Amino acid sequence: MLLDLFVYFAQFPATAGIKKGIATKGKSNMEEYGTILKAIDNLEDKQLVPEIENYVYGQSFDELKQRIDKLAGSFLFVDYGEVDMQGDGHRSFECTQRIAVTVAMKLSDNADMLERMIANDRTLQMVAKIHAHLMADAERGNLYWMDRDSVTNCEIVPFVSAELHSYGWTLMLSAKGADILDTHQLARRLMRE
């Protein structure tokens, strides 16, 4: 599921900024590595919000900081959190995963208030474009990990990090989906063994 999220959000930034910093080795013994690289290559024509120049994905602030220290311009940072699983009464779960989708711009140390305001305006427009795509994809039923209601019940909050020299906005989502980890299906299969 986390790999599906990675590939989904990889369709938004400029293609050149996706692999840079994420797939630094280029190959791995892990089978999924090559599969994901091929999926990224197939996104060549997407670039749904090409003004986003870089892509950062993960949970670690230290990794985020290392990555952002090496880039310039705007970036999409997708941070995934805990999955809350509640029985739905039909031998399945309703799963809720916290996802934070940040679009920010790294500015120079000497950026003034007007430059910060422009960066905030640009990144807010980029977040709105991503949100619109999420809404359309959820409405079409293309996101098994998020239903239509959860994409419209969200929050957009400012992202300000003096440490990262970055300013932008974060779309906070509680993505709800039916047993997104297929836990019940696995349990039924194990019971038959």
Stretches with model-predicted labels:
Residues 1-91, 190-193:
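Small/polar-rich, solvent-exposed N-terminal microdomains that initiate assembly or binding
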Residues 3, 10-13, 166-193:
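C-terminal tail/extension regions appended to the core domain(s) of diverse proteins
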Residues 73-76, 118-177:
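Acidic-leaning, charged glycine-interspersed low-complexity segments
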Residues 84-93, 157-165:
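Exposed beta-sheet edge/beta-hairpin loop segments within beta-rich domains
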Residues 85-88, 106-111, 178-185:
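Short, cysteine-centered beta-strand-loop-beta hairpins and adjacent loop/turn segments enriched
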Residues 91-96, 104-133:
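Extracellular/virion structural assembly segments
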Residues 93-108, 164-179:
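Oligomerization/assembly interface segments of phage tail-like spikes and tubes
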